[in-house]
């Protein structure tokens, strides 16, 4: 049985080094999909590069933890910027859900302005769309707009409440991440999904060339290792040998 594999590179628009890495991993590797941060400092550069890579499916990386929001968010920003204190607000059940709803719609419209089309799917920076308070908002929005959504089903307790017309892959893995990146790790992710019986799988990745922005990230040099693995000719062969075909959320 043939299975669908979506290799999605997060953080398109984060920096020029990130953008170049994603394009390289698409052009000469197995990356088929990416998600863009519309408030990223290099988003215009990402848009420009994407015009020469029509095969790259582009979704939206909803941002609530970095940079400036597109709308007024006094309940979530500090000194006008977003940050990781969103976790504390979530634990205190103090998230400004109306502000988040408005920001989601604004980022979505901005994506369409930038790329000239709808995103193929939605996910989020630091997986904040999987917060129990935020997930219903994003799931409903994706269903209404007719676009797919990344769903990590492991922390999801209300899977039965998903909109009937919401599209997603059967499986999702964030395991291709960290200091032990290798071809063997990527293939183990596929084998684990096969054992679960997933007919479609998204694997998250972050391939990049190192620049000054990436150097400031807590996750820096492994991005370059990811790029090396994702452009390996032997990996592409091993994926096909396991019965997977590369695709995007347009195939879900």
Swiss-Prot record:
Reactions mediated catalytically: N,N'-diacetylchitobiose + H2O = N-acetyl-beta-D-glucosaminyl-(1->4)-D-glucosamine + acetate; diacetylchitobiose-6'-phosphate + H2O = N'-monoacetylchitobiose-6'-phosphate + acetate
Keyword Cytoplasm tagged: yes
UniProt keywords, alphabetically: Carbohydrate metabolism, Chitin degradation, Cytoplasm, Hydrolase, Magnesium, Metal-binding, Polysaccharide degradation
E.C. number: 3.5.1.105
Pfam families: YdjC
GO cellular component terms attached to this protein's record: cytoplasm
Entries under InterPro entries matching the protein: COD_ChbG_bac (IPR022948), Glyco_hydro/deAcase_b/a-brl (IPR011330), YdjC-like (IPR006879)
Pathway: Glycan degradation; chitin degradation
Subcellular location per the Swiss-Prot or TrEMBL entry: Cytoplasm
Class of enzymatic activity (EC top level): hydrolase
Cofactor needs: Mg(2+)
Listed GO MF terms: chitin disaccharide deacetylase activity; deacetylase activity; metal ion binding
Domain of life assignment: Bacteria
GO biological process: chitin catabolic process; diacetylchitobiose catabolic process; polysaccharide catabolic process
Keyword RNA-binding applies: no
Binding residues annotated for Mg(2+), in chain numbering: 61, 125
HAMAP family: COD (MF_01246)
Similarity-based family: Belongs to the YdjC deacetylase family. ChbG subfamily.
Role description: Involved in the degradation of chitin. ChbG is essential for growth on the acetylated chitooligosaccharides chitobiose and chitotriose but is dispensable for growth on cellobiose and chitosan dimer, the deacetylated form of chitobiose. Deacetylation of chitobiose-6-P and chitotriose-6-P is necessary for both the activation of the chb promoter by the regulatory protein ChbR and the hydrolysis of phosphorylated beta-glucosides by the phospho-beta-glucosidase ChbF.
Subunit and partners: Homodimer.
The name this protein goes by in its record: Chitooligosaccharide deacetylase
Organism: Escherichia coli O139:H28 (strain E24377A / ETEC)
Gene (name only): chbG
């Amino acid at each position: 049985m043939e299975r669908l594999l979506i290799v999605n590179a997060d953080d398109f628009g984060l920096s020029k080094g990130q953008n170049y890495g994603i394009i390289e991993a698409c052009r000469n590797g197995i990356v088929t999909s990416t998600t863009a941060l519309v408030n990223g400092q290099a988003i215009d550069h990402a848009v420009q590069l994407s015009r020469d890579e029509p095969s790259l499916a582009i979704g939206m990386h909803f941002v609530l933890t970095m940079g400036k929001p597109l709308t007024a968010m006094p309940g979530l920003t500090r000194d006008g910027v977003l940050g990781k204190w969103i976790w504390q607000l979530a634990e205190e059940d103090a998230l400004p859900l109306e502000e988040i709803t408005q920001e989601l719609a604004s980022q979505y419209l901005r994506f369409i302005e930038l790329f000239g089309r709808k995103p193929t799917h939605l996910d989020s920076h630091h997986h904040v769309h999987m917060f129990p308070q935020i997930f219903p908002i994003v799931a409903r929005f994706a269903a209404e707009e007719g676009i797919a959504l990344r769903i990590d089903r492991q922390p999801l307790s209300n899977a039965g409440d998903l909109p009937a017309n919401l599209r997603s892959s059967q499986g999702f893995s964030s395991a291709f991440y960290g200091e032990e990146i290798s071809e063997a790790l990527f293939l183990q992710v596929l084998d684990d999904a096969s054992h679960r019986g997933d007919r479609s799988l998204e694997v998250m990745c972050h391939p990049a060339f190192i620049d000054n922005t990436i150097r400031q990230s807590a996750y820096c040099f492994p991005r370059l290792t990811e790029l090396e693995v994702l452009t390996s000719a032997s990996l592409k062969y091993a994926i096909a040998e396991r019965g997977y075909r590369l695709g995007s959320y347009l195939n879900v």
